[in-house]
Swiss-Prot record:
It is found in: Nucleus; Endoplasmic reticulum. Residues 63-126 form the bZIP domain. This is X-box-binding protein 1. The modification Phosphoserine is found at S61. Isoform 1 interacts with HM13. Isoform 1 interacts with RNF139; the interaction induces ubiquitination and degradation of isoform 1. Isoform 1 interacts (via luminal domain) with DERL1; the interaction obviates the need for ectodomain shedding prior HM13/SPP-mediated XBP1 isoform 1 cleavage. Isoform 1 interacts with HDAC3 and AKT1; the interactions occur in endothelial cell (EC) under disturbed flow. Isoform 1 interacts with the oncoprotein FOS. Interacts with SIRT1. Keywords: Acetylation, Activator, Angiogenesis, Apoptosis, Cleavage on pair of basic residues, Cytoplasm, Developmental protein, Differentiation, DNA-binding, Endoplasmic reticulum, Membrane, Myogenesis, Nucleus, Phosphoprotein, Signal-anchor, Stress response, Transcription, Transcription regulation, Transmembrane, Transmembrane helix, Ubl conjugation, Unfolded protein response. The lineage of its organism: Eukaryota, Metazoa, Chordata, Craniata, Vertebrata. It comes from Rattus norvegicus. GO terms for cellular component: cytoplasm; endoplasmic reticulum; endoplasmic reticulum membrane; nucleus; presynapse; RNA polymerase II transcription regulator complex. Residues 69-85 are annotated as: Nuclear localization signal (NLS).
Amino acid sequence: MVVVAAAPSAASAAPKVLLLSGQPASGGRALPLMVPGPRAAGSEASGTPQARKRQRLTHLSPEEKALRRKLKNRVAAQTARDRKKARMSELEQQVVDLEEENQKLQLENQLLREKTHGLVIENQELRTRLGMNALVTEEVSEAESKGNGVRLVAGSAESAALRLRAPLQQVQAQLSPPQNIFPWILTLLPLQILSLISFWAFWTSWTLSCFSNVLPQSLLIWRNSQRSTQKDLVPYQPPFLCQWGPHQPSWKPLMNSFVLTMYTPSL
């Protein structure tokens, strides 16, 4: 049996649907065939794409609709499973990378702890060699108490002591020369002070003797120069002023004589 559902109009782009079934619908399933319908002449001439409309499934039976829905659900579920699997694989790779990085950091932390322990031992030995008391701070004790969870490699203290033997010998060799030089410094320091005192006394006496020889000569020269300047002075002669004349507005002989006596220098 063949059922043909034609398009409502020739100009519409909806395809024709042909349902081919050899038996009735209850006995078997129909196979839908999608046949493209003729396009409109105006749309071919213009070449503009038309908006795709959602296909209506009014021509399908309920069984066909349910089958189509099941297929869509299967495809969606498969894509979701693939996406979830890819995400899980990515997360697993991240976990592996983080575990490797954590192991590297733990190893580095352990090596740093060993190094600090060796440095503490070296510091204590140097303090004991210098005659100072080994200082055990509270921070070191707290760090050791907190670090009990992390196990140190056995024999780390022994290896640190073996590594520190050669540096300690070098430090001892470097510290021994100053200890030998210290008595020499104590003996040479007073001699140096005495030499400085004697040099200072000699310098002061020499400068005083030089100035004592130079000062009288300079005083004599200064006195001679003062005397020569006093001898070479020209006596001051006041200008001649007429006590009475047409240039005087009034007669003041006493005031004029007083002015003359004030300006005449004493010879």
